[in-house]
């Protein structure tokens, strides 16, 4: 917390402060509360929402790790509105009041829907103002009732209550908060955030964030999610810091309640952006926002890159719906496809696609390899049969698109080849009428898979 305060008290004069926002129209919420809330959710989603500690030999555990275990294990997760536990890959494990991006799987391990789980409400006077933990679960509006039935089917004897929040009660917004690079917004937001080890600390941080950026309107903020799915890309400046903000229905434009004078002589410029712009930015990096963007139960969570996200999936959390295949994939490392962004040369040709099935993507690289492999089959009676041409395997499938940017699930061997030989993947989408549309997977959008590629190459050499 001290570093966060120190940062905001030492900002120098600048002009590149921007707050850009967009209304998100298709979201609905289910409100969940009760002493078993976290235990209940932990058995349904891919994120690890409560810590479990394995006893270790005292000579193998560090003092720092032991202190962290002692602090987190002493928390009572069934009492008061303490927030949400985040077990991270790059950040330290911590308690937060910012939401968690997660997934609900079917019994076969396929993604039913992605979701955001928010501690609710975002700000309070004290965590003891509420007797039990309380959360909002965000879903696309068209599946909210189905997910409510799913929750009801799994409730059994769990001490939880949930109900669908009427759509007119809440409003959802996407917002970018950007500042000049020298002010290190990410470091000074994430560093103090990961220091929060109990509910009161997390609440103090949330209250400070709300008063800094929404002074005088803190009570209108009901939930906040800081999109940390691709932290490394944010640090490299490829992705702008994105926030999903849920307000009450009194807010007609979130720009009106944003505190543009938070830094005194450095006022924020405020602007509205379109949902199209935001979706295209996400698609570049293979990111989804609700199952209206893909066909439910067609993707594995790891194919959707959940293992690259900060706190969205965990390999050792124990039992949850769909856990068996996911755990096996983690253990064996056998995963054949990944979701990536693509560029599309003539997107108007896709206008009649009804999205009921993914469209096959073929790569010119595959055709070259297969043409070399085509050979005559040997006839045991002495004559040669006609050459047998292998069936061309798709390099991947187009999942969705917006204008000239799409998101596709692509075979990893193509991704690895592109990274190894430093080239884009030139390909084409095949329409149902066999017409083709040229597309390309940009090398710059594949950087995050480089370490995975190198690790698998080492394993193959051994």
Curated annotation (Swiss-Prot):
Keywords: Mitochondrion, Transit peptide. Residues 1-15 form a transit peptide. The keyword Mitochondrion applies. GO terms for biological process: iron-sulfur cluster assembly. GO terms for cellular component: mitochondrial matrix. It is found in: Mitochondrion matrix. InterPro entries: TrmE/GcvT_dom1, YgfZ/GcvT, YgfZ/GcvT_CS. Disulfide bonds: none annotated. GO terms for molecular function: transferase activity. Belongs to the GcvT family. CAF17/IBA57 subfamily. This is Iron-sulfur cluster assembly factor IBA57 homolog, mitochondrial. It comes from Kluyveromyces lactis (strain ATCC 8585 / CBS 2359 / DSM 70799 / NBRC 1267 / NRRL Y-1140 / WM37).
């Amino acid at each position: 917390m001290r570093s966060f305060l120190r940062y905001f008290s030492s900002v120098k004069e600048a002009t590149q402060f921007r707050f850009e926002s967009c209304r998100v129209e298709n979201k609905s919420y289910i409100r969940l509360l009760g002493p078993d809330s976290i235990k209940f959710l932990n058995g349904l989603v891919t994120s690890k929402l409560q810590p479990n500690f394995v006893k270790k030999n005292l000579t193998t555990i560090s003092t720092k790790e032991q202190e962290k275990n002692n602090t987190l294990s002493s928390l009572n997760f069934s009492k008061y509105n303490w927030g949400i536990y985040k077990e991270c890959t790059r950040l330290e494990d911590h308690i937060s009041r910012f939401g968690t991006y997660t997934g609900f799987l079917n019994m076969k391990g396929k993604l039913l829907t992605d979701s955001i789980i928010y501690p609710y409400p975002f700000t309070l006077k004290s965590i003891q103002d509420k007797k039990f933990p309380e959360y909002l679960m965000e879903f696309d509006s068209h599946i909210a009732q189905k997910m409510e039935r799913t929750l009801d089917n799994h409730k059994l004897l769990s001490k939880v209550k949930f109900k669908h929040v009427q759509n007119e009660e809440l409003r959802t917004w996407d917002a970018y908060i950007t500042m000049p690079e020298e002010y290190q917004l990410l470091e000074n937001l994430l560093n103090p955030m990961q220091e929060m080890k109990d509910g009161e600390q997390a609440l103090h941080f949330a209250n400070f964030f709300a008063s800094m950026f929404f002074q005088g309107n803190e009570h209108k903020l009901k939930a906040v999610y800081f999109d940390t799915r691709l932290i490394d890309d944010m640090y490299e400046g490829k992705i702008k810091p994105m926030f999903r903000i849920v307000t009450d229905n009194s807010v007609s434009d979130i720009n009106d309640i944003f505190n543009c004078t938070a830094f005194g002589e450095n006022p924020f410029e405020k602007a509205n952006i379109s949902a199209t712009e935001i979706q295209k930015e996400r698609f570049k990096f293979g990111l989804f926002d609700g199952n209206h963007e893909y066909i439910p139960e067609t993707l594995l969570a790891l194919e959707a890159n959940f293992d690259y996200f900060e706190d969205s999936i965990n390999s050792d959390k124990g039992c949850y719906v769909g856990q068996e295949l996911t755990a096996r994939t983690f253990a064996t490392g056998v995963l054949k496809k990944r979701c990536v962004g693509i560029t599309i040369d003539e997107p108007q040709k896709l206008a009649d696609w009804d999205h009921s099935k993914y469209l096959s993507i073929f790569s010119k690289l595959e055709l070259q390899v297969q043409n070399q492999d085509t050979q005559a089959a040997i006839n045991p009676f002495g004559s040669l049969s006609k050459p047998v041409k292998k069936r061309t395997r798709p390099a991947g499938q187009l999942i969705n698109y917006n204008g000239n940017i799409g998101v596709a699930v692509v075979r990893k061997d193509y991704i690895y080849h592109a990274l190894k030989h430093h080239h884009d993947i030139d390909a084409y989408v095949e329409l149902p009428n066999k017409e083709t549309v040229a597309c390309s997977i940009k090398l710059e959008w594949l950087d995050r898979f480089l370490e995975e590629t190198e690790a698998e190459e080492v394993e193959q050499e051994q």
